Curated annotation (Swiss-Prot):
Bilayer topology: Multi-pass membrane protein
Disulfide-bonded cysteines: none
Organism superkingdom: Eukaryota
Sequence ranges of Polar residues compositional bias: 21-33
GO cellular component, one term: fungal-type vacuole
Protein name: Vacuolar amino acid transporter 4
Pfam families, A to Z: Aa_trans (PF01490)
Cytoplasmic face residues: 264-301, 348-373, 432-438, 505-515, 583-621, 670-692
Subcellular location: Vacuole membrane
Keyword flag ATP-binding: no
Gene Ontology terms describing biological process: amino acid transmembrane export from vacuole; amino acid transmembrane transport
Record-linked InterPro entries: AA_transpt_TM
């Protein structure tokens, strides 16, 4: 018997239940979506795949789903039910794999109608309903059926055409839920299959809800949006759209999910466990999931996002850091730390890929156990608290200089300015949704860029015009043996950005290009750091201040405005820097869910998980606000006590917190997750030895530079 797929394309020959050698020109149509092989499925597939070309193999894998009909789940006592079961399985469980093709814009959206005359050995998809005219025309007989499809579409008044720019934001799990129907149950074994599938769905939803990703639930309005609202996304200005993706990345700092739950205020949502009273057919879940930016960010946007994450206040500390380390030593070490940082970021992504998890802490948990996750999260908290404290000191010193130069109020005590920042930061710390920080942070990035341009202009003017290219007095060209450890900490402080590496790589449309993008970002940041630091140090020599802005002409209106705007920028960026630390600490005090045991009249007990959200309980909300206020006060206090020695404060944060986070933990994770498995536990091979050397070098550097920064200088 010659089996044909309905489009006139030869699939193979079957006689007496045995599969003969298929034709070398065998092609599987793109429109066919599911195939059920009747007899000897494994042998048939193995035999056929061995004779196919790579192109045919890719096409067959891409367009078909194979189901083993010899499985006990598909055996019935009566053969007449066989075709009905096959059609039911195909229609209800196999045809959702291509739904996501809508977003690609060049795939058809198939709609398969079962036919009673379908062969038991091969069921071909027919009656393809596609919005893509090219797909119809490229198929066999497409020129004949093209006008028929158009006529049917035109006569259907209820049919809505999906615009090509509209993305399919409906979650995949929702597709499966909606596919359950009476036609899928009205066949032998239908209830059993539906119960098994429903059980798996509920387990999947329970696991997702119990994890940190549960916090991205949104209201029902997301699927009720019209096509025009989806098209409006493309009209958002490039910089704004790019920065919103930057906020998404910060909401998943180090791979953790720090977005608060988007539960409506009026909801009383619970997640119920299963017992013997659970219904076989549950009601469809109407809870919609907020579409994430995962897998959609272009390479250019990733470059800008990473570059913005590396450029902040650290670059303004580098001219003074060059004075601490010496010019040539500082330039060479800055280039070394750029290469070192790139390698550690790269092996962290490799460790993530080998472990199959998307969180810095979860990688440590999987490879070493809970203790590793604890110290990773602790280091993240210390780093973000240190960054926030440095930002507060920076803001206070620049506001102090601005008020003195413009309003001539004298040098205000830093304690007043610290109290002023506390009053601002406490309400901002109450923000749960990170997207509400978009406008302040967008302005902050604009002011930072403008400030860097002003710094380059004024330092270049002083060096090349005022000093006629002659370096200022006090420049140390070699190594400053007395203060070089302060440079190490400050340089690492400037290069620290490991918290955004994992979420940025996850959000890429083409993650295989991440190493190249990361290399370009590190190279660009290194060139920018060396240029600004060298210009500033040569222009002011030994008189260079901890923050280079304080060396600029204080009577110049542009300098005064930059001091004001840069201070505002850093002040508006501080809540974003503090956000991950607050969420990590808060998650330790408040678990995501609270177990509730519900007893029924028949003495059975059901376990329910109630979200521990402030939107459901005002006491929890204000208790969280109280803890956030305490965290802000602690950070401000740390900043106040470290304000007298800002360069030492920054160096200690870089040495004590950033070195283990950037240079020790990634090497440890890569050693256990990649190097040892690849070499079968042989430590003397190159990769394990390299990871081990990096670990001990990082530990020695952390201990020595931290000690020298605190006690030795």
């Amino acid at each position: 018997m010659v089996t044909n797929n309905g489009d006139g394309e030869h699939l193979g020959i079957r006689r007496n239940g045995n599969l003969r050698h298929p034709s070398n020109n065998m092609k599987i149509p793109r429109r066919a979506q599911s195939t059920v092989l009747n007899s000897n499925p494994f042998y048939s597939r193995k035999y056929s795949m061995s004779t196919l070309t790579p192109r045919d193999i890719c096409r067959s894998v891409d367009s078909r789903v194979f189901v083993d009909m010899s499985s006990p789940n598909f055996q019935t006592l009566e053969d007449p039910h066989r075709d009905e079961i096959i059609n039911s399985v195909r229609l209800n469980y196999l045809n959702s794999s291509k739904r996501s093709s809508v977003s690609h814009g060049n795939e058809a959206i198939p709609r398969v109608n079962p036919t009673k005359n379908s062969s038991a050995s091969t069921i071909a998809a027919a009656n393809v309903d596609s919005d893509d005219d090219e797909t119809n025309l490229s198929s066999a007989g497409g020129d004949i059926t093209h006008d028929i499809y158009k006529l049917v579409k035109a006569e259907d008044p209820k049919r809505l055409r999906r615009p090509r720019s509209m993305e399919n934001v409906t979650p995949k799990i929702e597709h499966h839920t909606k596919l359950s129907s009476a036609s899928g149950l009205n066949v032998p074994g239908g209830f059993r299959r539906e119960f098994i599938v429903n059980k798996k769905r509920q387990e999947h939803q329970l696991n997702d809800s119990a994890s940190s990703d549960f916090t991205s639930h949104e209201s029902d309005s997301i699927n009720q949006s019209s096509p025009s609202s989806n098209q409006d996304i493309d009209k958002v200005p490039f910089l704004t759209r790019n920065f919103l993706e930057f906020l998404y990345v910060f909401g998943h700092f180090a791979g953790e999910s720090f977005e608060d739950d988007f539960i409506p205020d009026s909801s009383n949502m619970m997640i119920r466990g299963e017992d013997e009273r659970s219904a076989l057919l549950s009601r469809p879940d109407h809870m919609k999931v907020l579409p994430s930016a995962k897998g959609t960010t272009s390479t250019k946007k990733v470059f800008l996002i990473l570059l913005k994450s590396f450029i902040g206040t650290g670059v303004l500390f580098l001219p003074n850091a060059f004075h601490n380390g010496g010019l040539f030593f500082s330039v060479s070490m800055l280039a070394f730390f750029g290469i070192y940082s790139y390698w550690c970021y790269y092996i962290l992504v490799q460790a993530k890929s080998s472990c199959g998890v998307s969180s810095f802490g979860d990688i440590g948990l999987k490879l070493y156990g809970p203790w590793m996750r604890i110290i990773i999260l602790f280091s993240l908290v210390i780093t973000q608290v240190g960054f926030s404290g440095a930002y507060m000191i920076f803001t206070a010193k620049n506001l102090q200089a601005f008020l003195d130069n413009v309003f001539h109020v004298g040098v205000l005590p830093l304690s007043y300015l610290m109290v002023f920042q506390t009053i601002i930061f406490i309400p901002l710390s109450f923000i749960r949704n990170i997207s509400k920080l978009s406008l302040p942070s967008l302005l902050a990035n604009f002011f930072i860029m403008a400030g860097l341009v002003i710094v380059i202009i004024f330092t270049a003017k002083r060096l090349f015009f005022d000093l006629m290219g002659t370096p200022a007095m006090g420049v140390v060209y070699g190594l400053n043996a007395d203060r070089w450890t302060l440079f190490i900490g400050t340089a690492i402080f400037a290069f620290e950005g490991i918290g955004l590496i994992i979420p940025v790589q996850d959000s890429m449309r083409n993650p295989e290009k991440f190493p190249l993008v990361l290399a370009l970002v590190i190279l660009t940041a290194t060139i920018l750091f060396i240029s600004i630091a060298t210009l500033g140090y040569l222009a002011y020599g030994s008189n260079v201040q901890t923050v280079i802005l304080l060396n600029l002409p204080q009577s110049n209106i542009f300098v005064n405005l930059i001091q004001l705007f840069y201070s505002i920028a850093i002040m508006l960026s501080t809540p974003l820097q503090l956000f991950p630390a607050i969420k990590i600490i808060e998650n330790k005090f408040f678990p995501k869910f609270t177990k509730i045991y519900v007893k029924h009249d028949d003495l059975t007990t059901r376990v329910e998980l109630r979200p521990n959200s402030g939107k459901l309980n005002w006491k929890i909300k204000w208790l969280k606000n109280f803890i956030r206020s305490i965290i802000v006060i602690i950070v401000v206090s740390i900043a106040y006590f470290g304000s007298d020695n800002l360069d030492k404060f920054v160096s200690v944060i870089g040495s004590l917190a950033c070195i283990p986070l950037v240079y020790i933990y990634p090497s440890m994770l890569h050693l256990r997750g990649n190097s040892l498995p690849e070499t079968k536990g042989e430590f003397w091979r190159f990769k394990p030895m390299l990871d081990t050397i990096l670990i001990f070098f990082g530990i020695a550097s952390m201990l020595y530079t931290s000690y020298q920064s605190i006690f030795g200088v």
